[in-house]
């Protein structure tokens, strides 16, 4: 589980366009900090031997973990709530990268398993469906509220509610 002694350990704070790196030696002391764009980030790892990369398990982390693993680099994804406890000063990208290195040393923090593309796709479908269901319920409840303002009570349940609202709107005798 330890990185190869001669190879550096890198804490990476991921962002949309700029990534912050904290590079540590074999004794986990930060010896260098770098701020890289996405293209520079890719070039940096392709052209360098690294023993371990530590990232927060957040958006795009699984993509980068798979990419780095394909290069033969060991990757650890740490749960975000546990990493926050290791930020020593104001929350900045540089402080987060250093906090990742500190958190990686803690044996109590269990790393997140890197998801395959298929696992991520299934998770995205489930989340999209949940979001759609939540917004559907919200829209139906809003329509129920509007109907109540006209003295029309709509039965509970999404299917029944939608059918009833449709009938009320189509009825020329309704107040709406």
Annotated model-derived regions:
Residues 1-176:
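A detector of single, family-specific signature residues
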């Amino acid at each position: 589980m330890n990185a190869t002694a001669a190879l550096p350990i890198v804490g990476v704070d991921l962002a949309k366009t700029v990534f912050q790196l904290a590079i540590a030696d074999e004794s986990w002391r930060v010896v260098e900090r770098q701020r890289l764009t996405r293209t520079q980030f890719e070039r940096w790892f392709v052209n360098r031997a690294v023993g371990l990369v530590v990232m927060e398990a957040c958006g795009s982390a699984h993509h980068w973990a798979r990419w780095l693993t394909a290069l033969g680099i060991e990757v650890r994804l740490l749960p975000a709530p546990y990493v926050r406890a290791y930020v020593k000063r104001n929350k900045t990208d540089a402080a987060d990268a250093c906090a990742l290195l500190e958190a990686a040393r803690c044996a109590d923090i269990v790393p997140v398993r890197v998801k395959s593309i298929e696992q991520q796709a299934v998770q995205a479908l489930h989340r999209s469906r949940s979001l759609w269901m939540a917004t559907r319920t919200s829209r139906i409840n809003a329509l129920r509220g509007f109907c109540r303002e006209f003295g029309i009570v709509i039965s509970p349940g999404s299917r029944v509610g939608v059918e009833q609202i449709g009938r009320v709107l189509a009825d020329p005798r309704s107040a709406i």
